[in-house]
């Protein structure tokens, strides 16, 4: 060995030393890897588990967002359908009111006698025994238009007057049953469709406590009651024709409360006011945490999305971490609480809007039905009075040939 090492040149000895050091370093690295064993593998497994958890988290977020998007779209379609129905009913209501207020009444072709005309007693044998003989002079004196001609205008003029200037006459008890039924029908409702909408007059009377939105505000535990909201106004109505022979009883007809067309202003006042919940105190860490900006909650944001977005700010905040509030900071707890309050107010506003629209649709449908009934009744009454005028004209022409 010594002979071989001595016989070798310096360059060959240097190459042998380098190769030996390389072999020693490779063997030492292999032994170190073998001695460590499983720690790199366990670290790799933990990384994979965290990635899987994050994938589950994002999958859950994606499904939640898809469900929220579908819910918003469905609610938007329902709102559009409800608004379209309200617009159609409002247009029909206005058309019926205009038709009821401007009903074309043909003028009679016969000439009316003077109001001071006194019909004398006529003998029974003056006229032949025919259809005219059934018309007695005593029966003609009971016609209400002849008795009240010097005090009130004719019925044709009454139909053209404003409802505030109509004085309802009290006719005799011998009136025909058709007029009695028509008058009783008109006196059964305390709200007349003749009255137009007057904000100056209706502002003097306040709406009763049966308002839909007021009920929602009182019944909802999520909204405060210290906000001064404008109350809708109710306009008093009066029947066009009172019941014949006796005044209309006050206890029999039930007052029909009609909705005043102040919906957009009420809803804007309802939704624009900030209504903090009275059951939860104000935030104690608003100024400390710097989160004193007002919560931006809109009706388009769904409840599940608002709660899920507040409950998950990053993938590291899993559901297990959120269930334990003891390890969270006061800023996080306060932010969660205020977000939940905003979601409650949003739900209360949405529920109030939905119930208001439903109630308005019901009121418009009922009012339109009443207007149709009144129009048909007025047409029948006009036809009846035209026949009465024709009979009176025939009698007058027979008495004065």
UniProtKB/Swiss-Prot annotation:
Family named by the database record: Belongs to the bZIP family.
Chief location of this protein within or outside the cell: nucleus
Matches recorded under InterPro entries: bZIP, bZIP_sf, NFIL3-like, NFIL3-like_bZIP
GO molecular function, one term: RNA polymerase II transcription regulatory region sequence-specific DNA binding
Keyword presence, Coiled coil: yes
Sequence segments annotated as region (Basic motif 1): 60-85
Complex formation: Interacts with cell death specification protein ces-2.
Coiled coil location: 361-388
One Pfam family named in its UniProt record: bZIP_2
Encoding gene per record: atf-2
Post-translational changes noted in the entry: Phosphorylated by mitogen-activated protein kinases pmk-2 and pmk-3. May be responsive to osmotic stress.
Function summary: Acts as a transcription factor that recognizes and binds to the sequence 5'-[GA]TTA[CT]GTAA[CT]-3', a sequence present in many promoters. Involved in the development of the excretory duct cell, by positively modulating embryonic transcription of putative transcription factor lin-48, acting in concert with cell death specification protein ces-2. Negatively modulates expression of key autophagy-related genes, bec-1/ATG6 and lgg-1/ATG8, and may link together autophagy and apoptosis during development.
Stretch list, region Leucine-zipper 1: 89-96
Superkingdom, natural source: Eukaryota
Name by which UniProt lists this protein: Transcription factor atf-2
Keywords: Coiled coil, DNA-binding, Nucleus, Phosphoprotein, Transcription, Transcription regulation
Region (Disordered), start-end ranges: 19-78, 181-256, 273-345
Bias type Low complexity, positions: 19-38, 181-211, 305-317
Organism: Caenorhabditis elegans
bZIP domain residues: 54-100, 329-392
GO cellular component: nucleus
Segments of skewed composition (Polar residues): 222-256, 273-283
Subcellular location: Nucleus
Basic and acidic residues composition bias: residue spans: 41-78
């Amino acid at each position: 060995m010594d002979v071989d090492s001595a016989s070798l040149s310096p360059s060959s000895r240097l190459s042998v030393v380098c190769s030996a050091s390389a072999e020693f370093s490779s063997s030492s690295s292999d032994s170190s890897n073998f001695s460590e064993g499983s720690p790199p593998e366990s670290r790799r497994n933990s990384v994979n588990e965290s990635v899987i958890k994050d994938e589950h988290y994002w999958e859950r977020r994606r499904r939640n967002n898809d469900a929220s998007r579908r819910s918003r779209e469905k609610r938007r379609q329902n709102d559009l359908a409800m608004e379209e129905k309200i617009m159609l009913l409002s247009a029909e209501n206005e058309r019926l009111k205009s038709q009821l207020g401007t009903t074309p009444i043909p003028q009679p072709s016969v000439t009316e006698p003077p109001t001071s005309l006194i019909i004398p007693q006529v003998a029974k044998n003056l006229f032949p025994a025919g259809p005219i003989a059934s018309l007695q002079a005593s029966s003609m004196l009971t016609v209400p238009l002849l008795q009240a001609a010097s005090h009130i205008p004719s019925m044709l003029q009454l139909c053209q007057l404003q409802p505030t200037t109509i004085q309802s006459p009290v006719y005799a008890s011998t009136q025909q049953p058709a007029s009695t039924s028509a008058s009783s029908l008109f006196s059964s409702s305390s709200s007349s469709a003749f009255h137009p909408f007057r904000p100056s007059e209706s502002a003097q009377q306040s709406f009763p406590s049966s308002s839909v939105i007021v009920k929602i505000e009182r019944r909802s535990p999520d909204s405060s009651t210290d906000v001064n909201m404008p109350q809708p106004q109710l306009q008093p109505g009066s029947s066009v024709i009172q019941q014949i022979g006796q005044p209309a009883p006050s206890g029999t007809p039930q007052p029909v409360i009609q909705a005043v067309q102040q919906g957009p202003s009420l809803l804007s006042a309802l939704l624009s006011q900030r209504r903090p919940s009275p059951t939860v105190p104000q935030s104690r860490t608003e100024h400390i945490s710097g989160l004193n900006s007002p919560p931006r909650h809109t009706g388009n944001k769904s409840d599940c999305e608002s709660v899920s977005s507040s409950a998950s700010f990053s993938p590291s905040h899993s559901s297990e971490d959120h269930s334990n509030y003891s390890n969270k900071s006061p800023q996080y707890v306060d932010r969660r609480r205020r977000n939940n309050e905003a979601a409650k107010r949003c739900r209360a506003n949405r529920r109030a809007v939905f119930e208001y629209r439903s109630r308005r649709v019901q009121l418009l449908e009922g009012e339109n039905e009443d207007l149709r009934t009144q129009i048909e009744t007025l047409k029948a009454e006009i036809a009846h009075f035209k026949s009465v005028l024709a009979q009176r004209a025939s009698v007058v022409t027979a008495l004065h040939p």
